């Protein structure tokens, strides 16, 4: 029998009690938040995309508490990750001093996140009315594609709640990989059909050089 991945501590404990069944800790599975960078207004629409602004994308690092996700949502079966390189692979060890400085710089700071996002939203011409962001007379609605097969549903709900708390209206669109892939990876981001997606990836081997991950996640291609 082959079983891969769980974020349920009780399930893990049951597996460990089964005689003759071996298990190992794997660091290959990781989740990330994919953001649509088109904009700041989607072409041929009045729909604002705040994530076209680099400072708003950056501010999400202060808004989201990775440690909460790892300890509470994943039941302690995960660890916070800030970069597209695995923390247990050689590249991270080589960059540990720089990585640690960045991890401290982007530690959770909700008030700073709110301040930066507020400043940038006002620059875009959005206004906060009754605690909700509006743009050209309509609520700023973020379409959030949330995977349902695993802990990403709870991660998505957690992040959606944070965004709603600072004034965004969030349309939570739940679905499986089959449901959502045509939108975020098979469609044109400029169509404005989504703003965020709960991405998930897996590393199947120990890599000595993960430099191409920066190209994959951070450049246009």
What is the meaning of each model-derived region?
Residues 1-73, 89-221:
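Extracytoplasmic/periplasmic ligand-capture domains
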């Amino acid at each position: 029998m082959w079983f891969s991945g769980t974020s349920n501590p009780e399930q893990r404990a049951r597996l460990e009690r089964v005689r003759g069944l071996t298990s190992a800790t794997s660091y290959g599975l990781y989740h990330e938040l994919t953001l649509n960078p088109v904009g700041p207004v989607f072409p041929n629409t009045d729909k604002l995309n705040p994530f076209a602004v680099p400072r708003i994308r950056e501010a999400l690092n202060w808004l989201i508490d990775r440690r909460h996700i790892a300890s509470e949502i994943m039941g302690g079966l995960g660890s916070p990750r800030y970069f597209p390189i695995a923390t247990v692979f050689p590249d991270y060890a080589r960059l540990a001093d720089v990585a640690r400085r960045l991890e401290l710089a982007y530690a959770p700071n909700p008030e700073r996140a709110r301040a930066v996002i507020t400043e940038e939203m006002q620059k875009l011409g959005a206004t906060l009315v009754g605690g909700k962001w509006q743009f050209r007379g309509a609520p700023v609605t973020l379409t959030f594609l949330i995977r349902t097969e695993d802990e990403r549903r709870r991660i998505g709900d957690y992040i959606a709640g944070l965004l709603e708390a600072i004034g965004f209206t969030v349309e939570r669109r739940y679905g499986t990989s089959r449901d959502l892939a045509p939108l975020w990876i098979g469609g044109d981001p400029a169509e404005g059909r989504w703003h965020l997606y709960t991405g998930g990836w897996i590393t199947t081997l120990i890599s000595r050089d993960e430099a191409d991950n920066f190209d994959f996640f951070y450049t246009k291609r």
